[in-house]
């Protein structure tokens, strides 16, 4: 809950994005230094955390991605996965399974975003993902982030490129 409050222009961009894509408006928004990509955190009252460097220039497709995580309660799922890992700290299969579930969650969020985007917006979405590929934000416990580690980016970009072509 630390960080600066969202600026009026950022709040307005979030409101317009939620309205455009018929998604719930994110009420709690913080601007934070020292992070590279936006992410959601908090189970009961999720907070959208936006990097200070992106506060005024954040793309609506990035907001769309994070709002889709919010709509589908991905922060709670991510927390439960971390809890499962903590309780099964001795079992490498659980770590592997949780990583697969997190990667699939990101892929599903990408698919949901692509279903709402049209034409050139889909290519731009893939480019945004590439720009965020080297983020370290996604590894924080209890968060969701558009960037989910460089290993998974190649697969996600391939899925974005194939979106709509594969039955």
Regions from the language model: what does each represent?
Residues 1-167:
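Hydrophobic topogenic segments
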